[in-house]
């Protein structure tokens, strides 16, 4: 999980979702997981 100021899709499988008021990226590749800090 990377905590970043700006989250964006890295590949075409990345999905931008909103959880508990935070923008997150979920992907089949676990290295692409991100959360807005």
From Swiss-Prot:
Its main location: plastid. InterPro entries: Ribosomal_bL36, Ribosomal_bL36_sp. The keyword Cytoplasm does not apply. GO terms for cellular component: chloroplast; ribonucleoprotein complex; ribosome. The keyword Lyase does not apply. Pfam families: Ribosomal_L36. It is found in: Plastid, Chloroplast. GO terms for biological process: translation. PANTHER family: 50S RIBOSOMAL PROTEIN L36, CHLOROPLASTIC (PTHR42888), LARGE RIBOSOMAL SUBUNIT PROTEIN BL36C (PTHR42888:SF1). Belongs to the bacterial ribosomal protein bL36 family. This is Large ribosomal subunit protein bL36c. The gene is rpl36.
């Amino acid at each position: 999980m990377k905590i970043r100021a700006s989250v964006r899709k890295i590949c075409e499988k990345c999905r931008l979702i909103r959880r508990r008021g935070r923008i997150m990226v979920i992907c089949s590749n676990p290295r692409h997981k991100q959360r807005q800090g």
